[in-house]
């Protein structure tokens, strides 16, 4: 029984020596030689053995990790009768333990619902087993500590004890195998006449040291290779020395040998760096960690430091380096990319390397959490827990497991979208609505009178789809909910979930996806679908094994399963023979590398600026270790480990080392370089930091040529270079050669033309062909006034809404249009009620106004947008506020009616099609017509002597006024159009001709009075009346004005209309008035605008031409902006700037353009 230690720094040939020695011995003896290496190194070590002639094919050598050796020995000696628990199973059991003890926890009771808490607990429990730290050890160490630490240890102890209780006698973890291995080594025949060689470790856990001790006692010889700075081995025990852990292992092994009377052979010491082929790399590896500052005087040829603007520029720079190295004879397998934070670079590396046609293997297990199958399980359970809310239901639906597996997927997706739109619009947010008896009713157009109309065939067809999809969801989900409600034990809960997955035919779905992926060449995706099912099956099996007999409720089950699902990962296939590897620095599985790219070498990353994370903080660990706990040291005391990690990277390549860092992250936040890079630049005086440029134009032609990669990927860069050329910058011949190369290949030429056309891109539309325009809009255009206003706002917006008929998705929320409908509906209902009872607006009392408003709201509330006003307490409050506004409006209209001779003769009057008044017909080119249709809020009439006046009143939920500038540009045509229609059709409506009295906006709102002193009730009433004054434009005729406000006196302003009478009886300049002639000109001009718009629509006008009036643009609330892509920074995309002018100037222009002059 012998111990020998092989010691030396990295790259001095320790592993090679061990392999050579075994190669010599094995030919002369029947002994077995067992190599023990870290878990992640077994595959690479086996490959090295196969490649070494002296060992290839030798049956007397075996390579194990500690865990694999444990499996081998326990198979031989017994001890594998207990079930092995995976990491997923461990975390589920820990969660069950924590939930059972939740009421007793002092610190962690809230943390039990925090994501990541159980994986951190699992790490701590693993460390406790590895370092042989018991709960009693922790409790004893914490006796004299602060309350927060003792409470934390109390909670850890409770959870750990319950966890051990759940596992007791039935299950094993990885760490248990090492404990059992130590006990069984002595019984093993397999270990007779063996030599053990332990290589690749920088430190050993307590468990591993115990196993090594037992191997020393059993085997002929144990050889341990350690990375040490041999000449200064005693210094290795200093606090921040990078070889501290190796040195501690060295002395621990010697101490064990001494205690067990094991003979110790002389150490074999290796001093010369045999790996590094260049002086610069050998020098750097030699002086790293040395406190003496030594410099390298020559310019290093095989060491480079690069800065990049960002991570993408960094990876693209490295990809160019790789391409150059392959031209010099290097293979991809000779190179590796190492990073501290692989999550910052994995997707980016995959994308960039693919664009350079560089095969890459990313050495990182991906979480399964985002796989549709995992998401489906999680969302389905959440849907039940949260009473069938929209979000979890449709997260589950979008995974497609509710779909009929035999149906066409595209058709099912379209049906699911229809269902989702219905659910969103109708506010279906609970189980009761989903399971409510009877079919859901679908109507495309919503409104107060919708329910009175029969359903169309299109509506019935959509309704059938909605109910078909609804049933596909409700049936399996209801059964799952019922089964979960009946379940009491872990087994019953697992069976409920399993039956649910069977019912939705989850296996068939996954198999179909796997086959499709395989047929299309996506082999990795096919394997993922396969793994998803097998992993979930194993998770449920493990759940039943561990917690099958445990009593659970649905919340505990959901939490434990969620923990298990979070822990699932896709397994990695080993890299192919010639790929470049991207790996995490700490877990890299690399041997015999020629070139290393160490990326992301930023401050705080290398060395890592540790933040307290995990269950125990740095302070906790330091305090516990001070009380003789064997826990690992805190992060802040791991500076030596950071230096050692950097040393491993530095000493890994034999030929070249590239170090790089980004100067900013994706959000532009500045990132500084690592202290290690500053140190290296200080040691290599002639090492110049270079930059990985994103724009190659400043480089030489030879350097620019390295930016040419695959044809597909080079196109983007070529386009940007040609864009610079267009602006007058010089262009290297490299890019002209690349350009010409695309057009030598017909296939590439087609793609290139499409991409390069962006150089001349203008975000402009082409006018539609006349036939297309007529197909879209009709030979005769039936349109509303608001549609024409939209056309004048932006032709493309009109095209999107009325030509393509695009719509924004409807949501179950109260919108401005709904409030407008309520206000209009209330006024219509009250007016109809007054007419039915032969009452007049002006004769109502204040109490009657309140009652009328209340009755109107009671009638309307259930009819507004799927009963939204009755859907919640919040909506009940909004209904109350709307009632206040309607009550106030009713009161104001009552007061105004008392002082006005005008009376309503029509409310919500339809014109056009089936309306009471015919359409306003506008003749267009080619014998076409524009037929206007719509609804007028209110038409008032007044008579005096032989004169009859008509006016229009429009109810608005926000403040409005009639701006003639907006009329002129076609943005506000509504009121004058309505006035034109009623005056034109006066004979039909009232049996006589009439004059236009004006157009007025009535603002429906709850007014407030602001005052700096206390006011009487009468003064408040007057102020409220002033704030209710209608805005608009009225006829400049004293008779008409006096009829609109019979209380108006000379020298006063009206509280009802925008009029003021001077002392001489004339209207003041502050009045908003127009003569009859001016009204006629405006009416004529408005018809001219409709004719202009109609002809342009038939001509196919679809320009992206939004206006800008002061700061107002139609883009502000446009739902099609992402579709049109309007960008004011493009010369082809500019606003139509409109200017305000004086009313008299506008009227003159209207007169000229309307053709009345």
Curated annotation (Swiss-Prot):
Pfam families: ADDB_N (PF21445), PDDEXK_1 (PF12705), UvrD_C (PF13361)
EC number: 3.1.-.-
InterPro entries (UniProt xref): ADDB_N, DNA_helicase_suAddB, DNA_helicase_UvrD-like_C, P-loop_NTPase, PDDEXK-like_dom_sf, PDDEXK_AddAB-type
Residues given in the record as ATP binding sites: 8-15
A biological-process GO annotation: double-strand break repair via homologous recombination
Cofactor(s) listed: Mg(2+); [4Fe-4S] cluster
SUPFAM superfamilies linked to this entry: P-loop containing nucleoside triphosphate hydrolases (SSF52540)
Binding annotation for [4Fe-4S] cluster: 794, 1115, 1118, 1124
Gene3D superfamilies, alphabetized: 3.90.320.10, 6.10.140.1030, P-loop containing nucleotide triphosphate hydrolases (3.40.50.300)
Key words of the record: 4Fe-4S, ATP-binding, DNA damage, DNA repair, DNA-binding, Exonuclease, Helicase, Hydrolase, Iron, Iron-sulfur, Metal-binding, Nuclease, Nucleotide-binding
Cofactor note: Binds 1 [4Fe-4S] cluster.
One GO MF term: 5'-3' exonuclease activity
Domain UvrD-like helicase ATP-binding: 1-277
Further comment: Despite having conserved helicase domains, this subunit does not have helicase activity.
Function: The heterodimer acts as both an ATP-dependent DNA helicase and an ATP-dependent, dual-direction single-stranded exonuclease. Recognizes the chi site generating a DNA molecule suitable for the initiation of homologous recombination. The AddB subunit has 5' -> 3' nuclease activity but not helicase activity.
Oligomer and partners: Heterodimer of AddA and AddB.
Family classification: Belongs to the helicase family. AddB/RexB type 1 subfamily.
Name of the protein described by the UniProt record: ATP-dependent helicase/deoxyribonuclease subunit B
Organism expressing this protein natively: Listeria welshimeri serovar 6b (strain ATCC 35897 / DSM 20650 / CCUG 15529 / CIP 8149 / NCTC 11857 / SLCC 5334 / V8)
Organism ancestry: Bacteria, Bacillati, Bacillota, Bacilli, Bacillales
